[in-house]
């Protein structure tokens, strides 16, 4: 598998796992951090640096997976912004 394909696969896996985080704030932070980090390192050409970043990304993927499990064990109430119900307009 090429390095580019590995990076894209890692990127997608990180985003998918971050979507599973139970807390809205953590989900949004993780997705933003993943996108920003990959964009910032898009132009890296040094293979040693790419390998280091890929290893760091794999560690972060495992970290997110653990946090998802912990988050589901100790879940809290959802925030108002997370409610999927739409409010009906009042008849005032």
Curated annotation (Swiss-Prot):
Return any one Pfam family short name: Complex1_LYR
| One GO cellular component term | mitochondrial matrix
Q: Which GO terms describe its biological process?
A: [2Fe-2S] cluster assembly; iron-sulfur cluster assembly
Q: Could you list this entry's UniProt keywords, alphabetically sorted.
A: Coiled coil, Mitochondrion
Select a single GO molecular function from the record's annotations and give it.
structural molecule activity
Q: Where in the cell is it found?
A: Mitochondrion
Q: Does the keyword Phosphoprotein apply?
A: no
Positions in coiled-coil regions: 48-68
Disrupted gene: resulting phenotype? RNAi-mediated knockdown does not affect circadian rhythms.
What family is this protein classified in? Belongs to the complex I LYR family.
Quaternary structure annotation from Swiss-Prot or TrEMBL: Component of the mitochondrial core iron-sulfur cluster (ISC) assembly complex at least composed of the cysteine desulfurase Nfs1, the scaffold protein IscU, the accessory protein bcn92/Isd11/Lyrm4, and probably fh/frataxin. Interacts with Nfs1.
Per the entry, what this protein does is: Stabilizing factor of the core iron-sulfur cluster (ISC) assembly complex that regulates the stability and cysteine desulfurase activity of Nfs1 and participates in the [2Fe-2S] clusters assembly on the scaffolding protein IscU.
**This protein's name:** LYR motif-containing protein 4 homolog
| Native source species | Drosophila melanogaster (Fruit fly)
């Amino acid at each position: 598998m090429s390095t580019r394909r590995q990076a894209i696969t890692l990127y997608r896996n990180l985003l998918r796992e971050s979507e599973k985080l139970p807390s809205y704030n953590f989900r949004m932070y993780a997705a933003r951090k993943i996108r920003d980090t990959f964009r910032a390192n898009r132009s890296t050409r040094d293979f040693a640096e790419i390998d280091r970043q890929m290893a760091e990304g794999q560690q972060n993927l495992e970290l997110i997976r653990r946090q998802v499990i912990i988050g589901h064990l100790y879940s809290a109430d959802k925030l108002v912004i997370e409610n999927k119900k739409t409010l009906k307009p009042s008849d005032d």
